[in-house]
Amino acid sequence: MWAFPELPLPLLVNLFGSLLGFVATVTLIPAFRSHFIAARLCGQDLNKLSRQQIPESQGVICGAVFLIILFCFIPFPFLNCFVEEQCKAFPHHEFVALIGALLAICCMIFLGFADDVLNLRWRHKLLLPTAASLPLLMVYFTNFGNTTIVVPKPFRWILGLHLDLGILYYVYMGLLAVFCTNAINILAGINGLEAGQSLVISASIIVFNLVELEGDYRDDHVFSLYFMIPFFFTTLGLLYHNWYPSQVFVGDTFCYFAGMTFAVVGILGHFSKTMLLFFIPQVFNFLYSLPQLLHAIPCPRHRIPRLNPKTGKLEMSYSKFKTKNLSFLGTFILKVAERLQLVTVHRGESEDGAFTECNNMTLINLLLKIFGPIHERNLTLLLLLLQILSSAVTFSIRYQLVRLFYDV
């Protein structure tokens, strides 16, 4: 049985501040509703018959509350150093890690809000987290600088027990930040999904950190909890308003904020591989979406499911294009995906010639293909259940299957 150790005072203070953050988030979002609408940061829910204007970019409120909690929390991990007799040397490396992590998250919230306001292109969406991750990588370089990994057992006869990746390790961490920020943004489009999946991931990380507090890397997991606990409660406050029927939209701001927060704790907490395992649905969704993201298959602006007004349920959305415009690679991918029952393809003739229509390649549409039309709230619940199951699989891999690859 897992036993959670007694929590240190800074974590209890962090928990108390996070509870206040939940109340603040729940209160501030409706209070600022009119301000966002007046600034035209609003839109219509495409999956509702109502054309009511709904405030967007509410992730900026959630992110602001999160930052205020942690700014106020900064002195508490170092309370012993306020009493000279209890502090032999100030832990500058811990302080730098805390400040650097906050800087990276703060930059990502700012850049995410800029994306919501300016509606940037996808190539810019890749550059933003790259820029915001630079403070994070510099903190890792100055505090740790370790780029050596333990090689899995099946490859040790070739590579040895340890392998120094050098600069490639920093490339990996930069790509991890880019992936985390965009993975949540790609798996989105229905009420409660962005905040819901982030809530499940953060809860899973909190459980993982608590289990590991009695291990050899206690300080790393305490550091992770400093961020995950306030993130969980502020996200819970956002989800309260974003749940079906949504009163607000979280915007790209929240997706970037959530992704960078996960990247920060995964990198500076030294559990990036476990972190990626918590993203199993997002990894699958990314790989499944890749043909459209790379435009091998035409990708419309919105790939969200479409509402059937008669049934009130969501159905698959489709991408329609001229068959002759599809490249050889796109044709090959589409045939393979169709053979594997991963897409539904319709072919026909129109006045403009032969056309092809296939469902948009997202995990949301794939579930609709498998289970048929589903009510939006139930579809969100199904996706969150999948996220919870993937976390259960992650814990099984981390504490059982890992023995096949590493000496634990």
From Swiss-Prot:
Residues that carry a glycan: 146
Location(s), subcellular: Endoplasmic reticulum membrane
Enzyme class: transferase
E.C. designation(s): 2.7.8.15
Cofactor: Mg(2+)
GO BP: dolichol biosynthetic process; dolichol-linked oligosaccharide biosynthetic process
Any one of the GO CC terms: membrane
Pfam short name (any one): Glycos_transf_4
Membrane topology: Multi-pass membrane protein
Gene Ontology molecular-function annotations: glycosyltransferase activity; identical protein binding; metal ion binding; UDP-N-acetylglucosamine-dolichyl-phosphate N-acetylglucosaminephosphotransferase activity; UDP-N-acetylglucosamine-lysosomal-enzyme N-acetylglucosaminephosphotransferase activity
Transmembrane segments: 11-38, 59-78, 92-118, 122-143, 167-186, 193-213, 219-242, 251-269, 272-293, 376-400
Quaternary organization: Homodimer.
Job of this protein: UDP-N-acetylglucosamine--dolichyl-phosphate N-acetylglucosaminephosphotransferase that operates in the biosynthetic pathway of dolichol-linked oligosaccharides, the glycan precursors employed in protein asparagine (N)-glycosylation. The assembly of dolichol-linked oligosaccharides begins on the cytosolic side of the endoplasmic reticulum membrane and finishes in its lumen. The sequential addition of sugars to dolichol pyrophosphate produces dolichol-linked oligosaccharides containing fourteen sugars, including two GlcNAcs, nine mannoses and three glucoses.
Record-given protein name: UDP-N-acetylglucosamine--dolichyl-phosphate N-acetylglucosaminephosphotransferase
Species, as recorded: Cricetulus griseus (Chinese hamster)
